[in-house]
Amino acid sequence: MIHMTDTFEKTYTDWSIDVGEYKYEGITLKEVEQNLYSIQDNDMDFLIVSPSKAISVGNKLYNFVQVCSDQHTELLHIEISVTNDGEQGAIIYGKNELGHQEVLQIIEDFIAHHKVPTLDDWEIVLDLRPKMESYVKGTEND
């Protein structure tokens, strides 16, 4: 039986943490958790956790997860960058007012199990896709 601590202490070598001042590869979920506390304490502005190669789930590629503080609250704001299969440019989905544990769970699922949340109730924060979609896709709209 695998205990929580195994996943927690394990080093995920093909993942990196970027907090602005520094970035390093080979991360543990324990470090992720400590960084989340730092954000909540306003010692740190943001945290980006990214795989060396985007994670493919379904027909989407998941590029990175970013966490920052939810303004004026003790809570956290999380964003996930997603690219649809065959498309250029990512869509950034965001969710506000999440607790520490919820955010950690999302990141743990992503890193340890390559599982991602359903983004139906997340808002689109930024759409970085080129605006020429119908042209690129060709005859779909005819």
Language-model segments: which ranges?
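Acidic, proline/glycine-rich low-complexity IDRs
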Residues: 1-44, 55-142
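A short glycine-rich, His/Asp/Glu-containing loop-to-beta-strand
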Residues: 47-49
